[in-house]
Amino acid sequence: MSEKPEKIVLASGNAGKLKEFGNLFEPYGITVLPQSEFSIPECPEPYSTFVENALAKARHAAGHSGLPALADDSGICAAALNGAPGIHSARYAGSNPKSDTANNLKLAAELAGKADKSCCYVCVLVFVRHKDDPRPIIAEGVWHGQWNGVPAGENGFGYDPYFYLPGHGKTAAELDSEVKNRESHRAQALAELLRKLAL
């Protein structure tokens, strides 16, 4: 990136993501601000792909803040369900209220009779310099695993207790944070984003 921004707005209200991205950019002298600081209204996510929704959120945040913006969209995709839950992962069992337990039970029921238990976590990050940026920077991470019918582990959220990694012999929720922060879909996308930003 030829001109390094001093500030970036994160198109999310998630405190965990704000901390993660804040820590990532801090060594480069870049401050990551939450979109709540600019009273940015929630962005509609009408698209059927992670990248289109992340791009919409990034442009929305940049347009309202006047700053470069970073957005992510992520979820889990089951091969036997043609990629579902996909972009609907967070609200798979409904959104009133969102519930990890309900989402997991719904996906477990849908995969119960399927022979193919392969699934993957996907994270797409989009960075725009301004709302009309014709060259958004897009990074993607994919973490391959298997759906495990029995949950295990406490170090995670979402679908982590059911997301089994044969190479580790553990679910994502059983991995320690150091391994997770190195191998996860989000870690892969962040590494690619940093390479593309060339900070």
From Swiss-Prot:
Binding sites annotated in the UniProt record for substrate: 12-17, 74, 157-160, 180, 185-186
Key words, A-Z: Hydrolase, Magnesium, Metal-binding, Nucleotide metabolism, Nucleotide-binding
Cofactor: Mg(2+)
InterPro entries linked: dITP/XTP_pyrophosphatase, ITPase-like_fam, RdgB/HAM1
UniProt-recorded Gene Ontology molecular function terms: dITP diphosphatase activity; ITP diphosphatase activity; metal ion binding; nucleotide binding; ribonucleoside triphosphate phosphatase activity; XTP diphosphatase activity
GO cellular component, one term: cytosol
EC nos: 3.6.1.66
Gene Ontology annotations of biological process type: nucleotide metabolic process; purine nucleoside triphosphate catabolic process
Annotated S-S bridges: none
Annotated positions binding Mg(2+): 73
Entry annotated with the keyword RNA-binding: no
Reaction(s) the record says it catalyses: XTP + H2O = XMP + diphosphate + H(+); dITP + H2O = dIMP + diphosphate + H(+); ITP + H2O = IMP + diphosphate + H(+)
Record text on cofactor binding: Binds 1 Mg(2+) ion per subunit.
Active site: 73 (proton acceptor)
Matching Pfam families: Ham1p_like
Protein family: Belongs to the HAM1 NTPase family.
Entry function: Pyrophosphatase that catalyzes the hydrolysis of nucleoside triphosphates to their monophosphate derivatives, with a high preference for the non-canonical purine nucleotides XTP (xanthosine triphosphate), dITP (deoxyinosine triphosphate) and ITP. Seems to function as a house-cleaning enzyme that removes non-canonical purine nucleotides from the nucleotide pool, thus preventing their incorporation into DNA/RNA and avoiding chromosomal lesions.
PANTHER family: INOSINE TRIPHOSPHATE PYROPHOSPHATASE, INOSINE TRIPHOSPHATE PYROPHOSPHATASE/HAM1 PROTEIN
Subunit note: Homodimer.
Protein name (database record): dITP/XTP pyrophosphatase
